[in-house]
Design a protein with these regions (language model features):
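Bacterial N-terminal signal peptides that target proteins for export
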Residues: 2-14
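Bacterial N-terminal signal peptides
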Residues: 12-23
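A structural boundary/capping signal
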Residues: 27-243
Length: 243
C-alpha cells in the first residue's frame, strides 16, 4: 500500500469536483432491485467455472440484502467488499499495458487494478440504487507521483463528498483526503473536468480526453454486450439499471 502526502491544492480540487458531480436529489429515486434468475448464474458457471459463478452469486446476494440500507452503509460495504479483490497489474492479468476491465471481467478473473476496482464499485452501487449523477471517477496523483483512480460520491449540495479508494479501507470525505492531487474527474454521462496545476477547473468535451475516455466507453460497450448475452437467461429482463 502506498503512503500518501498533503497537497494544498486538494481543497480547491474538492470544490471543483463537487461542482462537476453536480446536485442530485437527497431522496433517491432508486430503481427497484429485481434478483437475477438462477439461469444467469448457471450460464456464468458453465462459461467461467464454478468459482466465478459463486463470486457472482455472492455479490448479488450482498446487493439484494443491502439494497434498502442507508447510503453510508452501502458506501462502506461496497468499499470493503471490492477492496478484497486482489490487485493485479494489467500486463500480468490482461497482457496489455492499460486495460479497463468490466465488473464482470474483474469478478470472473478475481483480480484487477485501481480502475477496474473503481468501475466495480460504481456498478455495485448502481445496482444498490445509487443514482448515476451522484457518482464520478477521479483520476488523481499520490505521494509517490503514481497515477491512481478512485470512485467519488456526493448525494446533494449540502452533503460531503466521499472517496472510495482501493488503497484505503475507510470511506473518507474529500477534506480528509489531503493526500491526493486531482488531475481530472469524469462521469458516466461524459462530463469531464480537467484540473490544472493551479487547481483551476477547465470544462472540456469528452473527446479531448482521448484515450482514457475511449477506454471507459469501450469498457461500457463490452459490459453492455456481455449483459445482453445473459439476458436470455433472465427472462429477457435487463441485468443492470437503465440498460
Amino acid at each position: 500500500m502506498m503512503n500518501f502526502y498533503c497537497r494544498t491544492t486538494f481543497k480547491t480540487f474538492l470544490f471543483f469536483l463537487i461542482l462537476s458531480i453536480g446536485v442530485v436529489s437527497s431522496v433517491f429515486a432508486a430503481h427497484t432491485f429485481v434478483p437475477w434468475e438462477d439461469g444467469v448464474f448457471v450460464a456464468i458457471g458453465k462459461e467461467h467455472g464454478l468459482e466465478a459463478e459463486k463470486r457472482i452469486r455472492t455479490i448479488m446476494d450482498v446487493i439484494q440484502a443491502n439494497h434498502e440500507k442507508p447510503v453510508m452503509e452501502k458506501l462502506k460495504l461496497t468499499n470493503d467488499y471490492l477492496n478484497n479483490i486482489p490487485w493485479i497489474a494489467d500486463p500480468d492479468l490482461w497482457k496489455r499495458e492499460d486495460y479497463w476491465a468490466t465488473p464482470f471481467e474483474t469478478l470472473t478473473t478475481f483480480g484487477g487494478d485501481c480502475e477496474d476496482i473503481a468501475i466495480g464499485k460504481y456498478a455495485m452501487l448502481r445496482l444498490m440504487g445509487i443514482p448515476d449523477d451522484a457518482l464520478g471517477f477521479a483520476y488523481v496523483e499520490t505521494r509517490d507521483k503514481e497515477r491512481h483512480m478512485v470512485l467519488v460520491f456526493k448525494e446533494n449540495d449540502a452533503s460531503p463528498l466521499y472517496v472510495l479508494d482501493n488503497q484505503v479501507p475507510d470511506v473518507l470525505t474529500g477534506p480528509e483526503r489531503k493526500d491526493l492531487l486531482a488531475i481530472y474527474v469524469f462521469q458516466n454521462n461524459g462530463k469531464l473536468y480537467i484540473i490544472d496545476n493551479k487547481g483551476e477547473k477547465r470544462s472540456v468535451k469528452k473527446e479531448f480526453m482521448g484515450r482514457k475516455f475511449e477506454k471507459w466507453a469501450t469498457a461500457k460497450e463490452r459490459a453492455r454486450e456481455n449483459r445482453k448475452k445473459y439476458e436470455k437467461y433472465n427472462g429477457g429482463r435487463p441485468l443492470f439499471p437503465n440498460d
